[in-house]
Structures are given as C-alpha cells and as structure tokens.
Amino acid sequence: NLADIAIVWAQTDEGIQGFVIEKGTPGFTAQEIKHKMSLRASVTSALFFDNVRVPDSSRLPNVKGLKGPLGCLTQARYGITWGPIGAAIACLSEAVDYTKERILFGRPVAATQSAQIKMAEMARRITLAQLLVLQLGRLKDAGTMQPQQVSLAKWNNCRMAIDIARECRDLLGGAGITT
C-alpha cells in the first residue's frame, strides 16, 4: 500500500526470475493486512495479480533461480535479528524503572539481591545478543555471512527476548499483566 514498487519473484519459462512491478500497473493491487499478531511495527500487504503484463525491462538482471529470493530472505532475516534486542532492552528498562519505584517491605524491589541478579542476567543476555549480531554484521560486510548463521542468531535473539519479557513481567508482578 505504501510502496511505489514491489519486487516479485515469479516462475517463467526460463525459471524463477525477479521483476520490479510499479504501483499502478494494470491488474496489480496491494491490500494492507490488518490486525496482525506479529510484525506490527511495519505495514504488510497482500499482493494481487490479475493478468498482469510487465515489460522485459522490469526483469531483474543477473538473477535467476531461487538464489535471488533466498538471498533476499537471508538479508531480511539478518535485519530481524536486531529487533528482539530492542524489545528486550525496552522490557528491561521498564522493569528497572518499576522496581526502583515499587516499595516492598520498606525498600524498593530493585534493592533486593534477587531482583538485581535477575536484571544483571537479563543485561548479560542482551549484551551477548548484541555481540552476536555485531559479529554477524562483520561477516555480512566481509561477504562471508552464511544463512545458517543468520538462522541461529535469529533463533537465539528471539528466544532471549521472549525469556526476558517473561522475567520482566514477573518482576512487575500484577502490574505486568494489566494495561
């Protein structure tokens, strides 16, 4: 809905190829997907093609087969490895602020050793995730990043963010489950 172009991969007589489809091309429409359960920070659209014809000049040069779309997917997934880090940092920041203000048995929850250990462990895991994707970025810049490395980083960082979100929810007590 927002983009002026779409990069589309399609099966042709010559195999899978990429095409640039411009907004306004007859037969091409995009419909925003609303009420998503995830990826809510960005607009996602369903693309519809009804007898769309594109000129040969719209074909992506030097890209044939699945290598093109899978390469794009790997690059996109690399970007996704960073998102959970931001989510985990936001959760930890909220937990730190809350535990400093929440008084329990005459002192802030943040003053208890158990809360401090939990928050230090969360900070350690966030730092490890940051270092992981920093190294992955270095490999990407060097042209040696492998898809399986991206998969492992995404898996690690998503798991880390989920674990930290749960731990922070527990630190917030009842405030962690209300709006």
Regions picked out by a protein language model, each given a short descriptive name:
Residues N1-A30:
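A short core secondary-structure module
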Residues G24-R53:
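Flexible, small-/acidic-enriched active-site or ligand-binding loops
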